[in-house]
């Protein structure tokens, strides 16, 4: 069977290796490579062409055969590829439907499948191919040589035979009237016939078997089948027929039918033999698949009968032999009462059976009295088997007869000595040395062969590899007759390791000249063997391959060093691994660790020695990746080698390749020499070195990291929750994904958003809260967005720009408004945790992210707070008109942006709710708290608006305002940016508890009147009646006075604090407690000498006031403002205290002094006004007194009195300081 297929390499690379290393080497590789499930494994079997043709005949049809014969080589190759897969995988193929078919469950597929759902597997394997070949040999009854001889002519004949199928004649028969009786089974199994019913029945058309002899079809016997009768229910009364007789007749008919079929096939075979043996008759032999199958089955039955007869004869023969032996040994009687027993060791042997105790039944009887006990102590005679003596089976004693030895005389003595000496040498493996007058030759024994010690085995290259002389050759030839003899050896099998081998060459061997009858192997050149005793030219022995066993020397040194230097073991070592595989793995490890072409080459070793550590790691990684697949092919037995090499690779290649990070860190640290920068530099340098760093450098890096951890821990402990210094709120680098703007159903062909029905309902926004821009007024008319607290300039004027580049750049210049650093006002807290979406955006270093110039657009709404802005067309019915939010309604842009995410069927309800619920409640200039609350209410009705994207919201901390940016942009820049980007995030302003000052900012306008509380207090501080009314309405304005020590002391000295205490002592105890603390603080501030000391007293006592006020919640506006002021003072005190401990100073004292000086100038202005008004009032009073005096007194005294009044007036107005009535004089 091996001649029907061969194993060949499918890859061209393996085929080239086959030409170099031989077919045996490739077969060994393919055996290791051929695993189950390898889909390319089938192409590695070169199957005989005849076998593939027979497989095609078996599974194909006439159309496939005709296509194969008439097709080109590509068609034949495709069909042969299918045939090969069916033979190697045993998966069926249907050529009509061109589908692969499972043999078990009829599953079909267009592609070859290796595993079916029913559990059958169709992997490519040599076992499947051998089974297919066996089936072909059995079905076609051919030998492997006959299958190899099958060619295309056989296929062509098979196709012709199939096309000329047996003609079958059909014999029609008319419709007959059959007697149909209903049949029922009686209880006794007898068929009874009742009244018959006549029904028409059509008999089946029978086919006649024919034999085609030449062109004459010969009909055979027509086989009639029993017609199928469908009966009707009824009873059978006839007793004329029995069931057994009918069944017997049916069986006989079936047997007769089988015999007729067999006779037909035999007749066909006879006809074919006649057509083959009588060519003169010109008869065409008959061929069909059924005939071939019947022929194979018939031969199989004959072979099976013959084999069964032979097996039966052998059984009878063996039975007779064992029966005779048993009878002769009398085993039946000897094994009586014995059985085969298996002992503990598993040995089967005969043993006597043990008697079983028989149970006895107690007879039940009535109770009676025992009067006598009788015992018979006699013993019965025990039965013993007679001893049958066995047959003597001992062997006879061997008697050695003395042998006579013939006397050795003459040369036979030397031969006798040599023979015995050689036998001893071969038996014990003893080396022997032949010595003549001027020559020596050493012969060694190895693996049952004799070898001569040659010079090249010791590394010496010479013309003659061993010394020679005539006497030595005579002795050598005579000695080799007994030492070597005539052991067969093929010279072509000699290779490396055969140096010095002694053998007797044959006549046809390709060998060089040699002396005597024996040849001493030295090497080979050009396929020719050379003797070690021959003198060769330098050109010959320099090029020849000397068959020295280098591996033996290598393993000799390896074994000697390994045994000498290995450590003692704690267990008993066993040989579990293949030595050959150990050598292969050792070679791979050598190549990976020391990449070279030859391990004995000094140049290769010099290159390996001259490598630096980086080159060693790179070479190791490269070689390991190249040979990893080969190393993994040896399985888990050598997993320790792969693990060690991988660990070594990780250690040597643990280098830091991130040069960019190293340079950036070094650049940012620059030349800073103070801690912790020096520690960071040490760690950065050590990390960059990677595995090249020494142990000392790693120790230094660990110490530096410990110092950094200490520094950071100390810094972290100094930062508490809610502090400004630790706040970071970076803006997201990715733009928000708004699904409403990316839905294809809501975009036009240009990708713009389609409002649909929302556009019609959006008119409620534009009619109530937007105004149309009048172009006749010019864009500059709308460029100033004025609010009650300030002005913001928008960039609507930049819609008209100059084509001059210089002027256009001037138009793009922004107006920067400094908002200061991040303060407590920028941060929102909830349970002492940051609420980032309700806070201002910061950069990486904690500085605020400020707005830039916003360029204008026409008829758009601008969305997005992170990434690039998104421009959506306004839902206006007039495309040429431009709309801008009315004064105080900039926040309507938020609800207009929410309309984008509202479904069209809800747009009407949404716009109505905005108009009736939001617009009516918020009005102009609402706070962010109210806007967020209304947005939360709308989300309850319209959940789709929760993810709506907001326009950018800018925060103006100076004006306590939030600006909602529309499409007209902003020229003013420098505003802080609110991080909230969606409606869900904006709603966080309306959820308590939230500690945020920005929630009270107005959206697009003026802040609460409390923003000017201090200035309002300064305006009425010299107006007793107005100050009395203000402190009764807003008692916590006294706490606001802590912003300026001058204002605080003025209130205290004027008696306003005492008056407020007397007023509120009967009305609110919480307010009284706060006023009492403020009065005590005023006494402490009075003792302070400088402004800095006064501020320190206020800030040190701010926390106590804050804790006292934080216990309650008061309805006054000044309460929230004073609470926030105290919180700022308390936090700034903690921050400055930490900085002062670290040795840093702040600019806050200088700032406070400057502000206080400014407030004192305001006080001076107020005081000047009061003095001026007092002077005028005094002069008017004096004039009135003079007039009255002139009327009452005499005229002569009027002049004198007038001078006295003028002098008194001058004294009071210019010098008298107590002439002006103070505020304290007005409280009564």
From Swiss-Prot:
Motif (Involved in interaction with stylet and aphid transmission): 598-601
InterPro entries: DUF3725, HC-pro, HC_PRO_CPD_dom, HC_PRO_CPD_sf, Pept_S30_P1_potyvir, Potyvirid-P3
Disulfide pattern: none
Keyword annotations: Host cell junction, Host-virus interaction, Hydrolase, Inhibition of host innate immune response by virus, Protease, Serine protease, Suppressor of RNA silencing, Transport, Viral immunoevasion, Viral movement protein
Domains as described in the record: The N-terminus of helper component proteinase is involved in interaction with stylets. The central part is involved in interaction with virions and the C-terminus is involved in cell-to cell movement of the virus.
Pfam families associated with the record: DUF3725 (PF12523), Peptidase_C6 (PF00851), Peptidase_S30 (PF01577), Potyvirid-P3 (PF13608)
Coiled coil spans: none
Post-translational modification: Potyviral RNA is expressed as two polyproteins which undergo post-translational proteolytic processing. Genome polyprotein is processed by NIa-pro, P1 and HC-pro proteinases resulting in the production of at least ten individual proteins. P3N-PIPO is cleaved by P1 and HC-pro proteinases resulting in the production of three individual proteins. The P1 proteinase and the HC-pro cleave only their respective C-termini autocatalytically.
Signal peptide, first to last residue: none
Residue intervals of the Peptidase S30 domain: 408-547
Entry EC number(s): 3.4.21.-, 3.4.22.45
Keyword Protease applies: yes
Domain Peptidase C6: 882-1004
Name of the featured protein: P3N-PIPO polyprotein
An annotated Gene Ontology molecular function: serine-type peptidase activity
Protein family according to the UniProt entry: Belongs to the potyviridae P3N-PIPO polyprotein family.
Keyword Lipid metabolism in annotation: no
GO terms classed as biological process: proteolysis; symbiont-mediated suppression of host innate immune response; transport of virus in host, cell to cell; viral translational frameshifting
Higher taxonomy: Viruses, Riboviria, Orthornavirae, Pisuviricota, Stelpaviricetes
Any one GO cellular component localisation term in the record: host cell plasmodesma
């Amino acid at each position: 069977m091996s001649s029907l297929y061969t194993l060949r390499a499918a890859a061209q690379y393996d085929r080239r290796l086959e030409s170099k290393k031989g077919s045996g080497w490739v077969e060994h590789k393919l055996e290791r490579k051929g695993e189950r499930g390898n889909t390319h494994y089938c192409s590695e079997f070169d199957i005989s062409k005849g076998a593939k043709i027979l497989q095609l005949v078996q599974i194909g049809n006439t159309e496939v055969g005709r296509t194969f014969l008439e097709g080109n080589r590509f068609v034949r190759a495709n069909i042969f590829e299918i045939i090969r897969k069916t033979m190697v995988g045993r998966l069926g193929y249907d050529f009509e439907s061109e589908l692969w078919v499972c043999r078990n469950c009829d599953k079909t597929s267009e592609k070859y499948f290796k595993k079916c759902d029913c559990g059958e597997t169709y992997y490519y394997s040599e076992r499947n191919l051998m089974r297919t070949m066996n089936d072909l040999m059995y079905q076609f009854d051919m030998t492997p040589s006959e299958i190899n001889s099958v060619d295309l002519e056989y296929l062509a004949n098979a196709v012709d035979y199939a096309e000329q199928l047996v003609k079958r004649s059909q014999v029609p028969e008319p419709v007959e009237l059959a007697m149909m009786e209903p049949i029922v089974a009686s209880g006794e199994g007898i068929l009874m016939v009742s009244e018959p019913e006549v029904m028409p029945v059509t008999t089946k058309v029978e086919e006649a078997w024919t034999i085609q002899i030449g062109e004459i079809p010969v009909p055979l016997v027509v086989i009639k089948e029993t017609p199928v009768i469908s009966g009707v229910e009824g009873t059978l009364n006839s007793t004329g027929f029995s069931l057994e007789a009918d069944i017997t007749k049916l069986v006989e008919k079936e047997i007769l039918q089988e015999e007729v079929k067999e006779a037909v096939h035999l007749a066909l075979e006879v006809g074919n033999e006649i057509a083959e043996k009588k060519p003169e008759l010109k008869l065409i032999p008959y061929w069909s698949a059924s005939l071939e199958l019947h022929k194979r089955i018939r031969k199989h039955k004959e072979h099976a009968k013959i084999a069964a007869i032979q097996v039966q004869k052998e059984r009878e023969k063996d039975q007779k032999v064992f029966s005779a032996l048993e009878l002769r040994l009398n085993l039946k009687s000897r094994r009586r009462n014995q059985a085969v027993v298996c002992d503990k060791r598993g040995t089967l042997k005969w043993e006597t059976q043990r008697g079983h105790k028989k149970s006895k039944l107690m007879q039940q009887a009535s109770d009676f009295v025992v009067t006598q006990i009788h015992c018979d102590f006699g013993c019965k005679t025990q039965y013993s088997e007679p001893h049958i003596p066995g047959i003597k089976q001992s062997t006879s004693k061997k008697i050695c007869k003395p042998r006579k030895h013939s006397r050795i005389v003459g040369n036979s003595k030397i031969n006798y000595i040599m023979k015995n000496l050689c036998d001893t040498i071969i038996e014990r493996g003893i080396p022997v040395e032949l010595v003549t007058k001027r020559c020596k030759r050493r012969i060694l024994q190895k693996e049952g062969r004799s070898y001569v010690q040659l010079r090249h085995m010791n590394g010496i290259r010479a013309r003659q590899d061993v010394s020679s002389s005539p006497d030595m050759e005579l002795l050598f030839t005579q000695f080799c007759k007994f030492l070597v003899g005539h052991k067969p050896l093929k010279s072509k099998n000699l290779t490396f390791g055969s140096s010095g081998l002694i053998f007797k060459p044959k006549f046809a061997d390709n060998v060089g000249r040699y002396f005597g009858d024996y040849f001493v192997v030295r090497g080979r050149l050009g396929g020719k063997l050379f003797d070690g005793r021959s003198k060769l030219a330098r050109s010959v022995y320099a090029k020849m391959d000397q068959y020295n066993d280098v591996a033996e020397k290598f393993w000799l040194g390896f074994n000697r060093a390994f045994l000498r230097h290995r450590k003692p073991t704690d267990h008993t070592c066993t040989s579990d691994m293949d030595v050959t595989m150990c050598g292969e793995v050792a070679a791979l490890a050598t190549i990976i660790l020391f990449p070279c072409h030859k391990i004995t080459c000094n140049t290769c070793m010099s290159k390996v020695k001259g490598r630096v550590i980086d080159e060693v790691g790179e070479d190791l990684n490269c070689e390991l990746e190249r040979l990893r697949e080969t190393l993994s092919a040896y399985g888990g037995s050598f997993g320790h080698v792969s693990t060690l090499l991988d660990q070594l690779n990780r250690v040597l290649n643990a280098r830091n390749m991130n040069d960019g990070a190293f340079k950036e860190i070094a650049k940012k640290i620059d030349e800073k020499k103070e801690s912790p920068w020096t520690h960071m530099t040490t760690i950065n340098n050590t990390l960059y070195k990677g595995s090249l760093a020494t142990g000392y450098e790693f120790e230094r890096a660990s110490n530096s990291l410990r110092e950094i951890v200490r520094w950071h821990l100390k810094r972290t402990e100094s930062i508490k929750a809610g502090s400004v210094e630790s706040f970071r709120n970076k803006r997201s680098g990715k733009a928000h994904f708004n699904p409403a703007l990316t839905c294809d159903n809501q975009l036009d062909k240009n990708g713009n958003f389609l409002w649909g029905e929302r556009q019609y309902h959006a008119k409620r926004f534009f009619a109530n809260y937007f105004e149309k821009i009048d172009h006749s007024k010019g864009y500059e008319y709308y460029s100033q967005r004025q609010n009650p607290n300030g002005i913001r300039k928008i960039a609507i004027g930049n819609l008209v720009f100059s084509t001059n580049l210089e002027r256009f750049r001037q138009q793009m210049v922004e107006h920067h408004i400094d908002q200061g650093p991040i303060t407590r006002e920028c941060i929102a807290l909830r349970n002492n945790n940051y609420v980032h979406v309700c806070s201002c955006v910061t950069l990486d270093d904690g500085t605020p992210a400020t707005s830039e110039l916003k360029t204008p657009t026409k008829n758009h709404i601008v969305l997005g707070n992170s990434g690039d802005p998104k421009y959506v067309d306004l839902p206006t019915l007039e495309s040429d008109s431009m709309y801008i939010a009315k004064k105080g309604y900039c926040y309507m842009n938020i609800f207009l942006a929410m309309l984008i995410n509202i479904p069209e069927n809800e747009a009407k309800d949404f716009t109505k709710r905005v108009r009736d619920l939001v617009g009516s409640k918020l009005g102009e200039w609402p706070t962010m708290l109210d806007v967020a609350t209304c947005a939360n209410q709308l989300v309850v009705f319209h959940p789709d608006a929760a993810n709506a994207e907001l326009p950018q919201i800018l925060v103006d901390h100076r004006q306590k305002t939030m600006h909602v940016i529309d499409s007209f942009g902003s020229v003013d820049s420098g505003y802080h940016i609110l991080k909230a980007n969606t409606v869900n995030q904006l709603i966080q302003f309306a959820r308590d508890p939230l500690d945020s000052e920005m929630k009270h900012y107005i959206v697009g306008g003026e802040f609460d009147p409390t923003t000017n509380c201090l200035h309002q207090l300064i305006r009425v501080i010299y107006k007793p009646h107005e100050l009395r009314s203000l402190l009764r309405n807003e008692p916590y304005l006294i706490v606001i006075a802590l912003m300026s020590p001058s204002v605080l002391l003025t209130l205290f000295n004027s008696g306003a604090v005492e008056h407020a205490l007397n007023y509120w002592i009967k009305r609110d105890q919480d307010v009284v407690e706060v006023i009492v603390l403020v009065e005590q603080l005023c006494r402490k501030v009075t003792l302070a000498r400088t402004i800095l000391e006064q501020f320190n007293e206020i800030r040190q006592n701010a926390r106590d006031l804050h804790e006292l006020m934080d216990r309650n919640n008061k309805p006054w506006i000044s309460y929230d403002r004073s609470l926030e002021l105290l919180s700022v003072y308390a936090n700034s005190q903690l921050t400055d205290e930490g900085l002062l401990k670290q040795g840093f100073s702040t600019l806050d004292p200088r700032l406070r002094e400057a502000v206080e000086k400014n407030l004192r100038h305001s006080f001076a202005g107020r005081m000047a006004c009061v003095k001026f008004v007092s002077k005028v009032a005094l002069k008017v009073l004096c004039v009135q007194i003079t007039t009255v005096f002139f009327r009452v007194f005499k005229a002569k005294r009027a002049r004198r009195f007038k001078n006295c009044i003028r002098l008194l007036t001058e004294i009071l107005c210019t010098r008298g300081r107590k002439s002006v009535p103070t505020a304290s004089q007005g409280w009564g």
